[in-house]
């Protein structure tokens, strides 16, 4: 019955989703401020159409929040759905095969920025609610909170939660912003990595210099920066910041055995990424490296002349944006200062170095023995025909740990993305069939949760 409803309403549902995707709600770029408001307002309209009692766009210190609720019984359990309506920048535009903010369905996939992360996935939650509400199947209360700053650190949501604890009070938080192991291998995310993000600025001479007149006599900030960040990771994949691993907890033997049982084709992995070989911390599998171990990566690097042709200069400045994915028990503030101190200490006196931490967040581990998790297991099993595997993933949703800290509530991460969906990259996409299965699985979660509750 659920499947039939989704099939019959597919065209309408997709067009509703596309109305969200067409709004370029890029939180990282200030010139999209009006788009953030437009997207929040559109979410409000769609949630009201889906059947909530009330929906409102609420102010925060940054981009607005979208809050909605459907209260069937004040004494019943309450599920709070969290999602985000902001998206990553679409650049570089020239690498897209379609227009990033003009969604199309091609080869069975939705192609657009936000098709997966997180408009497509949040919309799964909204349409699942629409179904159970319309068919009088909702036996617990539902609340929704969608923010517009997840991709830039969720700095406004923590204070908003603190201010509106009673409004957001719930028994479990349901999130669709993660991935499956494979389209036919369901999984529930039981762990997220934390995050720390910095910008480094290296300054040398007071202006760009002629590379013939000054080359070999003056330190080149670009060369220095490359050396500084290149020295951070050793050939064994270890990160060399002193004290970086102090709070890293090793996975247990049982956890490592579970990870080893997860289907993973290394050759297919390399082929899908277009790489000849993998790299990472020696002694750990790829899945362990991305879910159980911390990482360090350059996210952006720029300096000097970047136009067409040649310009022989020693640049005055060089910049890098770097991130570190952290594991539970690592404190992003502690790591943040540790990295700042390290670069200031090792930088040569031929340049000056400025390291600024831009944002960060804590990791999260979800228990697998509480009622909502069991309901999610059965929700997946009803649609995919097999029990989902519990997995930790490499991404970060820092606000999840904040929810637990401020509301005392656990989260269940029912994600429906795939690695091949290219989130944060050109040609982001979402398989339509998997998207529809997601709606079915979330509907079944709610039905199973009522049995548990």
Report residues per predicted region:
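A short core secondary-structure module
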Residues: 159, 215-236
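N-terminal helical capping/dimerization or prosegment-like subdomains
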Residues: 1-93, 317, 334
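Acidic/histidine-rich catalytic neighborhood of metal-dependent amide-processing enzymes
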Residues: 110, 116-191, 453
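Flexible glycine/proline-rich, aromatic-decorated loop/lid segments
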Residues: 187-203, 417
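Acidic, glycine-rich active-site loops and adjacent beta-strand->loop/helix elements
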Residues: 85-87, 109, 145-153, 176-180, ...
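Active-site metal-coordination/substrate-binding segment of hydrolases
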Residues: 76-143, 437
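An extended, acidic, His-containing surface patch that forms the Zn2+-binding/catalytic region
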Residues: 49, 182-183, 240-317, 328-338, ...
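A common structural junction motif
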Residues: 85-86, 232, 236, 341-350
